[in-house]
Each structure stands twice: as structure tokens, then as C-alpha cells.
Amino acid sequence: PKQGENFEPSPGFHEGNAWNYTFFVPHDIKGLTKLMGGNKKFVDKLQSVFDRGNYAPTNEPNIAYPYLFSRFKGEEWRTQKLIKELLAKHFTNQPAGIPGNDDTGTMSTWAIFSMMGLYPDCPGVPEYTLTTPTFDEIEVKLDPKYWGKDKLVIKKEGKGDYIKEIKLDGKKYGKYLITHEDLINAGEITFVTMDR
């Protein structure tokens, strides 16, 4: 914790390195994409984080990185593939079943959101990036006094790992980002899945 204090030499990063922090600009992915030279260069560099083994699922700075692919049309499948692989590899039902320190529930929360098929990848922005849920049906109890409804239902149709279609209350929804308000007002979100 005292590294870099009193002008001591420091690597410039805490609990990570340049790979872990390069894409940590959740509030301005569009600006970062432009800075990197466009969509293809951004996606290629992001994919290299995973291909080279530089993704660190044990710490917060880059835990949202798998979800960034869904910001680019046609690349959403990468998010869906990575989330399934990361859940299987790093989260088990054993005493040490989470990667690293849970840091006040951060890693457990990442796993729960990911299993539900949605993740709030930008702190302070009330929206979620969508991915394939783990379970066939999830029912989230809501207090109707605050939400106007008593539940949010998340359904997965089919046995595939990839999303073919997303529906809100039975109507086609063509995006992989959803606002908190739209999600709660919908009452039901259905992920129709397929094999790649």
C-alpha cells in the first residue's frame, strides 16, 4: 500500500499492469476506440489481452473487459464465448471457488450478474451489457412499492451458447445494452439462443 510514497520508484500501476488498465475507460469506450484507430484495431487489441493470457479475472480493473466486445456490432459473440469460459474456469462450488480476493463481494457479484446474462460494465451509468444467461429461468423479486412490479423474469430459450435474439416482453429487442429503467419496466427478458 505504501509503494510510490515519498517519491519512491513505482511501476505506475497498482494491482495490475498496462494490459490490465489499457481498456479501463468505461465512461468513454467510443473515445478510446477512436484513439486506438477504430473498431477493428480496438477489437483486435482487446482480443489479444485474452489470447496472450493477460486478462486477470482476479482483480477489478479489467473484469468488465469481456463485455466490451458487445459494444461492437458483430462482435457480441466474443462476449458470450468468454463469459461462459471464464465462469467455468474461475468460479466453482468449492471453498476457494472464486479467483483471488472477493474484495467485498466484487468477484461474486461479477459471477452472479454474468450468470443472469447482464452486467453493469460502467460504474455510475444505469445500463447493462447483455450476454447469454447460464440458467433457463431466473426470477428476481422486486418490491412493487418501488418498481411497480413484483418480479423481473430472465429466460433462456434453447440450449445454445450464443444469442440469436433478445425479446423484452415478447417484442424483439435489437441491442446488447439495456437501461435499468427499460429492464425493470419490461418485466421479462428472453434470450433465444443458438449454436455459433
Model-derived features: where do they sit?
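Beta-strand-rich recognition domains
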Residues: 142, 152-158
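Short, isolated positions in well-ordered beta-strands
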Residues: 147-152, 173-174
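C-terminal beta-sandwich/jelly-roll accessory domains of carbohydrate-active enzymes
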Residues: 157-196
